[in-house]
Design a protein with these regions (language model features):
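Feature captures hydrophobic
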Residues: 2-168, 182
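Conserved class I S-adenosyl-L-methionine
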Residues: 185-195
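Conserved beta-strand signature within the Rossmann-like core of class I S-adenosyl-L-methionine
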Residues: 289-297
Length: 449
């Protein structure tokens, strides 16, 4: 027994003498890698230039140093009221956030992404539960921020000042009816994801077009039904309760197919893997040559689930054909580079699903190029795309202003935690739109014969 131990000790000593250089080098590399992940980034601004720390935490080494703070600490401190954003009312509260907050990819983010994917299955039951939770908890807040119609439509600010959001929305709705859908009384319109029904009521009233609108919850149905009664469009408009799976219910047997279909932000909550099935179901209820219009929120192609080589640029483009004048390589302001830019994308979408809208994960994984590719595969020909990213930034800034103006009422109805979560969410969203790291588009497609 003693001899065996002596032999093992001798062998271990021999191995150590032979490989001690490699072992020491490995330990040094591991130590360097660990220290590198814990390094502090130099911040161009002091955090106190962007945050307004509360008296209980300021002065503090964390908020007065010129080293970046972690995004986990920032989100936690903000939601607990320890800090506030400067210029939050203007929507520019997160304009320089990347200068003072470190959006590095770490195990915390990896775990949160994993939990998000594991908890989001997009079954019919879970999708219904998520949208009911979102509508129930956010209804009164959305009325204060988006207006009584709660329409998440991007304004058209070519001829309007930002403060006149209602006027820009009216112009946008008119453009949808005339320029995009070209509606007339002989058409048959399907409105998927009709929200609270206001856009469907407007189109049915102004264009006298028979319309079927899909709303998600009973509260939305009650609002839409009352609005249609006030507008006296019941003979043109009917509502169906459900989600994208209810598309076929809007076309009973014996009725002619729809000539026009509208989907405002319908892709947001259906899940990336369900997009092909949704587009095929829309194709099945449309007649050949019918128009299909979508408003979509997407991620730059360099951050998408399957990055593409090309990205579209410019405000409004015709994409019939493949002209170099209509296409541009990634790098025209939309290419995302660097670890922190990539990680911020994931932190933002985790925050949105965790605190604002559960299940809204489609824009996290898909780019506008992928949406157009899925449309092509589903039997549509994409004929026009319009970038709304700049208008979306302006619209979101107006929403931020309205949120701050209604702060006291929102805190009384929903609590301070809900208000702070929405303040951070809207300012963060506006910042991503303004920096081209979140995209908004109109897409017009036509069903192929």
């Amino acid at each position: 027994m003693v001899s065996d131990n002596a032999q093992l000790l001798e062998q271990a000593t021999e191995l150590l003498l032979r490989y001690w250089v490699r072992a020491l080098t490995s330990l040094v590399l591991v130590a360097v890698a660990y220290l590198w992940t814990k390094r502090g980034y130099q911040a161009p601004y002091a955090p106190s230039d962007i945050f307004v720390p509360s008296t209980s935490t300021y002065p503090s080494k964390v908020y007065t140093s010129r080293s970046k703070i972690s995004v986990s600490q920032f989100v936690n401190d903000f939601l607990h009221g320890r800090i506030e954003l400067r210029d939050a009312h203007s929507g520019r509260g997160m304009e320089h956030i990347a200068q003072v907050v470190s959006f590095r990819f770490d195990l915390t983010l990896a775990w949160r992404i994993f939990r998000t994917f594991m908890s989001t299955s997009h079954t019919e039951y879970q999708d219904k539960r998520n949208v009911e939770k979102y509508v129930t908890t956010s209804d009164s807040l959305l009325e204060q921020v988006l207006g009584p119609d709660r329409l998440p439509l991007v304004g058209y600010f070519r001829d309007e000042v930002p403060e006149e959001l209602e006027n820009s929305l009216a112009v946008q709705m008119e453009r949808i009816g005339k320029e995009y859908l070209d509606l007339n009384p002989n058409d048959r319109l399907l409105d998927v994801n009709s929200q609270w029904g206001d856009l469907a009521v407007y189109l049915a009233h102004d264009y006298q077009v028979p319309t079927c609108a899909i709303v998600a919850t009973s509260s939305q149905l009650n609002h839409a039904t009352n609005l249609s009664g006030e507008s006296q469009v019941q003979r043109f408009l009917r509502f169906v309760t459900g989600d994208y799976r209810a598309v076929t219910q809007c076309l009973p047997a014996g009725l002619p197919p729809f000539t026009k279909v509208l989907a405002i932000d319908a892709l947001d909550t259906i899940g990336t893997r369900n997009i092909p099935a949704f587009l095929r179901s829309v194709n099945e209820v449309m007649e050949s040559g019918g128009r299909f219009m979508l408003q979509v929120t997407t991620t730059p192609s360099s951050l998408g689930y399957k990055p593409n080589r090309r990205a579209f640029s410019g405000h409004q483009q015709s994409i019939m054909g493949d002209s170099d004048n209509n296409r541009a390589e990634d790098g025209d302001g939309f290419k995302i580079q660097g670890e922190e830019e990539w990680s911020e994308h994931w932190w933002y979408h985790w925050f949105r699903q965790r605190y604002i809208q559960p299940g809204a994960d489609t824009s996290m994984l898909i780019s506008v190029e992928q949406v157009m590719g899925e449309l092509q595969r589903a039997g549509f020909e994409v004929i026009q795309m319009e970038s709304l990213t700049t208008d979306a930034a302006t619209t979101t800034a107006v929403w931020c202003n309205r949120l701050c103006a209604a702060k006291r009422q929102i805190e009384m109805e929903l609590g301070e935690d809900a208000y702070r979560a929405w303040e951070l969410y809207l300012n963060w969203t506006q910042s991503l739109y303004a920096r081209g790291r979140l995209h908004k588009h109109f897409i017009l497609a036509m069903k192929r014969a």
